[in-house]
Amino acid sequence: MADDIPARRENWAEADFKGGAKSVIALKSGHVLVSDEPAGFPGGAGGENAGPTPTGFLAAAFAADIPVILQRIARERGIALDAIRARVTIAWNPRGIAGLEDASPTPFEAVSAVTLTTAAPDAEIAALKAAYEGRCPLYNLLRKSGCRMVEDWTVERG
């Protein structure tokens, strides 16, 4: 099975700026997304709220990645997960994005609330969590940037 997995995989996105804070983004997959800022966003570029902000997309990508990685690991280990729910909050200092010298634009905290519905024993859940922390690309990208990672795991017995 490991021989079937390539050593490199790429994804790409191309943003076409439409003015204000709006961009239309084409993805390698053929999907098209719109990114924008709310109108009147303090320090913003004058958006129309036509789509999520770029940092909103970051939170969405991380939230979507959590169940994908957990289910993959669970399947490999024979752990039955009846449901997976992930809520992610990413905090950053908008003063950094505005270019103020006293602030960094790098996200400083990522909070993930993960709820699993499963009959798996606690030891299997602990091993699943440890494997997830080592294998989730976005978790590791944020962690290695210095972002404080806060996790709240809940297990509902199914």
Give the residues covered by each predicted segment.
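Alpha-helical metal-binding/catalytic segments enriched in His/Glu/Asp
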Residues: D65-I66
